[in-house]
Curated annotation (Swiss-Prot):
Protein family: Belongs to the plant self-incompatibility (S1) protein family.
Subcellular location: Secreted
InterPro entries according to UniProt: Self-incomp_S1
Signal peptide: 1-20
Entry keywords, A to Z: Secreted, Self-incompatibility, Signal
Any coiled-coil regions, as ranges: none
GO biological process terms held by the UniProt record: rejection of self pollen
Cellular-component GO terms for this entry: extracellular region
Organism: Arabidopsis thaliana
Name of the protein this chain belongs to: S-protein homolog 11
Gene of this entry: SPH11
Domain of life: Eukaryota
The keyword Signal appears for this protein: yes
Length: 143
């Protein structure tokens, strides 16, 4: 890598550090917008952390966790189940958060909303859009 490239990277990192949001934690938020009596079961993990199981009733109940990005690529993978627990009928597994690599994010918000037809995503500034469909549990694949 030449001196110009290295200097440019240092300037970008320093400029990002001077941001007012510097060191503000990132967050992942889950909201249960499923039908009446449908519980949302959530389990998220990273390379270093298992955040345990969380159960959300329908309505305004949310689950949120906060963290700082690591230079070594912060990732959180989550599993979601929906149904009338303990019998869950639908499942989804996806990456709920991935850092930007060498340039850490600060104050980034990933909002996931579970609805009957799937899981919707937004950063909070735009209308949520459908990202993942639910997979039925225990149903053999159709031929």
């Amino acid at each position: 890598m030449n001196c110009f490239s290295f200097s440019f990277i240092i300037i970008v990192l320093c400029a990002g550090s001077s941001n007012a949001k510097f060191r503000e934690k990132n967050s992942v938020v889950f909201k249960n917008s499923l039908g009446v009596k449908n519980v949302l079961k959530i389990h998220c993990t990273s390379k270093d952390d298992d955040l345990g199981y969380h159960y959300l009733r329908p309505g305004v109940q949310i689950y949120e966790f906060r963290f700082h990005d690591s230079v070594l690529k912060t990732k959180f993978d989550c599993e979601l189940w929906q149904g009338r627990g303990p019998t869950y009928k639908f499942y989804a597994n996806f990456r709920a958060y991935k850092s930007g690599g060498l340039i850490a994010h600060y104050g980034k918000k990933n909002i996931w909303e579970a609805r009957e037809d799937g899981i919707y995503f937004t950063h909070g500034k735009e209308i949520p859009k459908l990202e993942y469909k639910w997979s039925p549990i225990g149903k053999p694949p159709s031929p």
